[in-house]
Amino acid sequence: MSRRSTAAGETAKSDPIYRNRLVNMLVNRLLKDGKKSLAYRILYQAMKQIKQKTQKNPLSVLRQAVRRVTPNVAVKARRVGGSTYQVPVEIIPAQGKALAIRWLLGASRKRPGRSMALKSSYELMDAAKNNGSAVRKKEETHRMAEANKAFAHFR
């Protein structure tokens, strides 16, 4: 048996303004070429835009959006006997949240327009209202899992 102590789990840092780990996760996914200050600036502009448009706390809108986009199940490709099956698997909450953030930012990037701050603010507001591309992606994933429920025993 090893005598060394186990390493302490690294906790995610929270952002300077909202002191929220979810915001920090979003910034880290938004990050390009190591330009974190730019990512923070984009996200804070988006939050300001949300506050102006909805007159609500932007953090609660963000939480609501992530909650609405977070999937419970996903499909994984599993090769059995020469054919590939889409096998539905349950997702742990942390992985679901990471997927939701990825989908939200992907949908924001695909929106028409110039400013990423504007595009992401509109996508977050849409997701909080339960519509938008990211929510459609989640529903599509759930439909795929439902359609391939017969292959669940291949896990």
Curated annotation (Swiss-Prot):
Gene Ontology cellular-component annotations: chloroplast; small ribosomal subunit
Keywords for this protein: Chloroplast, Plastid, Ribonucleoprotein, Ribosomal protein, RNA-binding, rRNA-binding
Disulphide bonds in the chain: none
Gene Ontology molecular function, alphabetical: rRNA binding; structural constituent of ribosome
CDD domains: uS7_Chloroplast (cd14871)
Quaternary structure and interacting proteins, as annotated: Part of the 30S ribosomal subunit.
PANTHER family for this protein: RIBOSOMAL PROTEIN S7
NCBIfam families, A to Z: rpsG_bact
Role, per record: One of the primary rRNA binding proteins, it binds directly to 16S rRNA where it nucleates assembly of the head domain of the 30S subunit.
Family label: Belongs to the universal ribosomal protein uS7 family.
Name the UniProt record assigns to this protein: Small ribosomal subunit protein uS7cz/uS7cy
Taxonomic source organism: Angiopteris evecta (Mule's foot fern)
